[in-house]
Amino acid sequence: MFLMNLLSMIIPILLAVAFLTLVERKILGYMQLRKGPNIVGPHGLLQPIADAIKLFTKEPLQPLTSSTTMFIMAPILALTLALTMWIPLPMPYPLINMNLGILFMLAMSSLAVYAILWSGWASNSKYALIGALRAVAQTISYEVTLAIILLSVLLMNGSFTLSTLIVTQEYTWLIFPSWPLAMMWFISTLAETNRAPFDLTEGESELVSGFNVEYAGGPFALFFLAEYANIIMMNILTTTLFLGAYHSPTMPELYTTNFVTKTLLLTTTFLWVRASYPRFRYDQLMHLLWKNFLPLTLALCMWHVSMPITMASIPPQT
């Protein structure tokens, strides 16, 4: 039974990821005044399937000097962790209702760093290694602010369980009282998922393709799937934290519709940002975090700690 539940979660995720790549190419196309993929199937709808067949039937080449075990394990680990992070997400019911769901997700996203580091190091290529080191530094740095923002939100929530966030936001979405946190959270999720304008890891001009430069065929596809699964997962988390998950004041019954609409809007914003902004310089990226975001989030965290005490209010109890 649990296996069926697991499959009923994994298969839709992989399908969503496949069509997200198509949506991205279409949006980028129209924003650059051209059409996206439109040959395979009606309006290019079957393009992701063609891409998958092409990638998985190609020969998985491997550099002679690479460390075989790590080279093969890295993409598998990346995808496994990306899918594991979906387990505590309430949509509207989680696969496993964890008591410390948010901590579990933070821990899993920290482990994802190892997949990137292994792939860069095992490739035995200087480009891959530099890309991996950049990715690791960026991910670890932005996790600091993500954790502090989460803490601030949880002070209004009262527990580490994601399901209680939905109860907290029945009357007011948390984006209204804590919009500065929400803005910094969104920018940090962009950096955490290595998306433009923070995609320093795959700076084509200097690093060819970043940490996955030596990968081809199937293993490359696994990294690709992991990246896009993380994007959707982060947007679902943002929806749950700040946008009241599946609550809507006008249509409270339409759980799934509300939830999917909010997540899709956030995902489209990710793609819109990618099409609009140039890449940051690496020192600017670090400056933004350590000198702008970190002091701000710490100050706001102190503010959120003092709020319930001064207002003599308690968060919803579970």
Swiss-Prot record:
The chain crosses the membrane at residues 2-22, 70-90, 100-120, 147-167, 171-191, 217-237, 254-276, 294-314. It catalyses: a ubiquinone + NADH + 5 H(+)(in) = a ubiquinol + NAD(+) + 4 H(+)(out). GO terms for cellular component: mitochondrial inner membrane. It is found in: Mitochondrion inner membrane. It comes from the Eukaryota. One of its GO terms (molecular function) is NADH dehydrogenase (ubiquinone) activity. It is a multi-pass membrane protein. Its main location: mitochondrion. Core subunit of the mitochondrial membrane respiratory chain NADH dehydrogenase (Complex I) that is believed to belong to the minimal assembly required for catalysis. Complex I functions in the transfer of electrons from NADH to the respiratory chain. The immediate electron acceptor for the enzyme is believed to be ubiquinone. This is NADH-ubiquinone oxidoreductase chain 1. It comes from Tadarida insignis (Oriental free-tailed bat).
